[in-house]
Amino acid sequence: MPKDSTALLLVPTGIGAAIGGYAGDAIPVAKMISQVVGTLITHPNVLNGAGLYWPMDNTLYVEGYALDQFAKGNWHLQRVNSNRVGLLLDKGIEPDLLLRHLQVAEASRATLGLELSDYLVTDEPLEITLQTSASGASWGNITNPSSLLRGADKLINLAQAQAIAVVTRFPEEPPESIVLQNYRQGCGVDPLSGAEAVISHLIVQRFGIPAAHAPALNPLPLSQDISPKAAAEEIGYTFLPSVLVGLSRAPRYITKYQSNSISSADVDYVITPASACGGSALLSLASKGATIIAVEENHTQMRVFPESLGIKAIRVKSYLEAVGVIVSKNCGISLESLGPNISRLERL
């Protein structure tokens, strides 16, 4: 079966996706799709599972702003064997919590063989604020973005970092918070993820290198009423391991196409929640002729369907069905021929 196609798996962050709205719960979807394509491109929201991760050699870990630039044709993706990852820690993190994250960094070097530069603490607390939009999506702001960018600049220019992992102190939701309770029970929006995207976007936009974020939070009280989807966030002090692993093999972003790089013209399929079709990357790739596969059972807080934007999409119920579409098209089999009824040919 041909497997030289390229697919982009999108699950936008902070919109309450039923699959991919939690820490790493879309990894099984990525694993499955990676088996039927030559290259899978996706983003940290899909692949970050807090302390859990899954290596996939043909899967590229690309930050959201970089995905938008890639889809527009402004950037191309260059595979690498490894990146030297710089760790940028928020000055607002308490000493004990800071030490926990340094231990993760040391463990990733000793246990996984990752290459890290010396770390840096920002010169000011970054002070993150969290918000929820009227649509129910989460977002946030960073009070001191200049401190974030100064820290990243030093890691790049003084420590030769090729990718940046950021850990910032996030506000704590009280355990009795309805938002937090809903999320822990598998039926809410991640209140952190929208702000996380802002942090990584700033670095990627300014420096053009891979970046991803892990929040620093105190462990929550133990509870027996935790959804399996939220459980990855309950098992430790840190979300950093999967970020370091992802960045260690993240492709570099280049502005001049090379023969062995990947461009937006190479993307054959875009798989997205059916109700979240308004993103820049999807719109760009749809206009270039990529096959859009809209998954209906991955419900989100959004209501932006492909038909309302004039996008021709193949609607499927599940990711299992989405894989079937990819396999059949890769094999040159008409989708219509797989159904119980086939319409007659008409004379032009």
Language-model segments: residues:
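Short, hinge-like loop/turn segments at secondary-structure boundaries
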Residues: 58-61, 229-231, 311-312
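Hydrophobic beta-strand scaffold residues
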Residues: 40, 116, 210-211, 292
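Generic multipass alpha-helical transmembrane bundles of integral membrane proteins
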Residues: 134-142, 151-152, 156, 164-167, ...
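Metallocofactor- and cofactor-centric catalytic cores in central/energy metabolism, strongly enriched
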Residues: 1-180, 189-193
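C-terminal functional extensions of proteins
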Residues: 218-222, 239-269, 273-348
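Anion (oxyanion) recognition and catalysis
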Residues: 34-35, 204-205, 286
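A short acidic (Asp/Glu
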Residues: 21, 52-55, 175-179, 222-225, ...
